[in-house]
């Protein structure tokens, strides 16, 4: 509950937005100014005492009814916006999930951000030809909207304006529109055909991402740039002509367009960001003098960057000397590649560079490489051993995730950071030494490494992230150095062979489910430094019978020791100190 005092004269935009537990509000008569819509995504009861506004039939207007601030009827199926309304405010109809149809009068010139966001039953709406722009998120989540006529007055379509309009089948973008925002039609999975008008100059990032039914697309020769992921996952798109007007193509622009047979990079293109063609296996042709395309490999002009390798049949490849960067997803899903030679000129291996190269078994990373990107070797299931050179300072998230044959890896002293999920699912990895240069182990780094029986954790480490060693079922003993201050949620959950662990005096908190289902753990001494033990921290530790909890511990969450078979005297002592909630 909240009472707006009579001293208040102005209420700001979104002031009570998303206050889901607030049952009611009264706008006092002192309020003379309301900015935007203070009440979006709030469904409570509203009352207005101010003479500066009109509140009738659960709709809040300004005094002359030129501005519709908030529509609050959650049950109505249709609504006619009164003639004379000029502006529909930000999120005015948000989450009105019962509304099926709305009539917009010709007086309306402005529709605010997210005006109809979440109107999931809305199937019919006519936009008047006085509206000049469709703002960001205007129809976001209007999943029942089947068709829409965008009038010639509209000059721009905002970011994510029609995101998730999964029933929208067809659309004509009029000649008046000059820009299509990021994610404008993201997830419009029923959209089958589209004509981009002659006036559009830019197609935003992810503009048509996930339009999986889109078969026909015409891009006009007014377009100069195609954004990142603009047509990503348009899996039914069969043909596309990039016009000669385009000078720039974004990263992942045609990613996962699995039905697209061919593409031609026109001579007008001078800039390619990242890899526009990742997860696409069609035929590529390049007419641009700004790039080199030879033997099914796309490079930049001076061949310092390998953008895309497109030979799906080759079993081996030698990257030319002089290449400095292996681009994002450059070799993605090259299932036939068994070996690859990387020259000493390479300094960077990009995100997902060898993702899905399931036959790759022979690889040497040269001393010139300083970083291994996110998911760089994700799913390289035949890779058995790897030496990471002393030049590498960072290993990205998911870098070796799913490398299930990787049994031996050497991590150098130069390494300072290991990203989340970096070795997740490396089920053959037996032992590992983490160097002193590493200060933290992120979430899920060694999750699912079920053969990992021996690991050395350095004194430099200060934190062990959530799920860091979850499911390492062969890990039998572990010494946590006294530099560590926190053990994250589920950090050692499912380590069924872990029978001996020493928690140092530096640790102050043990996270939720940190040692859940460590069924071999028989004894444990919690140090004086620990003040709290998380929810279910030792749940399912069925062999744990000997436990020492110091007086420093003042909070033990529910179920912390559920399923632990303590002797009766120890169990009663713990119940006396912390209550029976810790066992249920």
What is each of the regions a protein language model found here?
Residues 1-10, 20-33, 43-59, 71-87, ...:
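Structural signature of tandem-repeat unit edges
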Residues 62-65, 300-303:
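Short acidic-glycine loop/turn motifs at beta-strand connectors
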């Amino acid at each position: 509950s909240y009472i707006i005092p009579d001293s208040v004269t102005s209420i700001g935009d979104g002031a009570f937005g998303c206050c889901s537990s607030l049952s009611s509000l009264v706008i006092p008569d002192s309020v003379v100014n309301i900015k935007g819509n203070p009440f979006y995504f709030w469904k409570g009861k509203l009352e207005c005492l101010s003479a500066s506004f009109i509140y009738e039939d659960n709709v809040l207007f300004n005094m002359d009814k030129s501005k519709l601030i908030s529509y609050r009827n959650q049950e109505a199926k249709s609504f006619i916006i009164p003639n004379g309304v000029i502006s529909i405010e930000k999120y005015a109809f948000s989450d009105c999930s019962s509304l099926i149809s709305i009539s917009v009068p010709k007086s309306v010139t402005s529709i605010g951000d997210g005006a109809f966001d979440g109107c999931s039953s809305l199937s019919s709406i006519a936009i008047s030809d006085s509206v000049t722009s469709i703002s960001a998120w205007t129809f976001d989540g209007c999943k029942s909207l089947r068709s829409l006529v965008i009038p010639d007055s509209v000059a721009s379509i905002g970011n994510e304006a029609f995101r998730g309009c999964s029933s929208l089948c067809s659309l004509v973008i009029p000649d008046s529109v000059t820009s299509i925002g990021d994610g404008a039609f993201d997830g419009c999975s029923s959209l089958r055909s589209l004509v981009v008008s002659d006036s559009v100059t830019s197609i935003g990032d992810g503009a048509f991402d996930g339009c999986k039914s889109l078969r026909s697309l015409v891009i006009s020769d007014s377009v100069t740039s195609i954004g990142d992921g603009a047509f990503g996952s348009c899996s039914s798109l069969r043909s596309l002509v990039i016009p000669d007007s385009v000078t720039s193509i974004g990263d992942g622009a045609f990613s996962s367009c699995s039905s697209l047979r061919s593409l031609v990079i026109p001579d007008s293109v001078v800039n390619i960001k990242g890899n526009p063609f990742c997860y696409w296996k069609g035929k590529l042709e390049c007419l641009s003098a700004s790039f080199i395309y030879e033997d099914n490999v796309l490079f930049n002009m001076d061949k310092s960057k390998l953008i895309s390798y497109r030979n799906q049949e080759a079993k081996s490849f030698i990257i030319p000397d002089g290449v400095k960067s292996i681009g994002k997803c450059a070799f993605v899903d090259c299932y036939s590649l068994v070996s690859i030679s990387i020259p000493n000129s390479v300094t960077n291996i990009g995100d997902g560079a060898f993702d899905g190269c399931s036959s790759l078994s022979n690889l040497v990373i040269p001393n010139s490489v300083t970083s291994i990107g996110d998911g760089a070797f994700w799913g390289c299931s035949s890779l058995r051993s790897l030496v990471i050179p002393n030049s590498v300072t960072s290993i990205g998230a998911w870098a070796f995730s799913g490398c299930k044959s990787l049994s031996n890896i050497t991590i150098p002293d130069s390494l300072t950071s290991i990203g989340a999920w970096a070795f997740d699912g490396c089920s053959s990895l037996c032992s590992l030494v983490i160097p002193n240069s590493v200060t933290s182990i992120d979430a899920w780094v060694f999750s699912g490494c079920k053969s990992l029986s021996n690991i050395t954790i350095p004194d430099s480490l200060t934190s062990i992230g959530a799920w860091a060693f979850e499911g390492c079922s062969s890990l039998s003993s572990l010494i946590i150095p006294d530099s560590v201050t926190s053990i994250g949620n589920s950090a050692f959950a499912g380590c069924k062979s872990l029978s001996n662990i020493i928690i140092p005096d530096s640790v102050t908190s043990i996270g939720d489910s940190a040692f859940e289902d460590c069924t071999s753990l028989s004894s444990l001494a919690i140090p004086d430094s620990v003040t709290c033990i998380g929810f279910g921290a030792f749940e399912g530790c069925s062999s744990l019978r000997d436990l020492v909890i110091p007086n420093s511990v003042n909070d033990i969450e529910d179920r912390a020791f559920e399923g632990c078979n303590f002797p009766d005297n120890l169990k009663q002592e713990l119940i006396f100190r912390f209550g029976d909630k810790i066992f249920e």
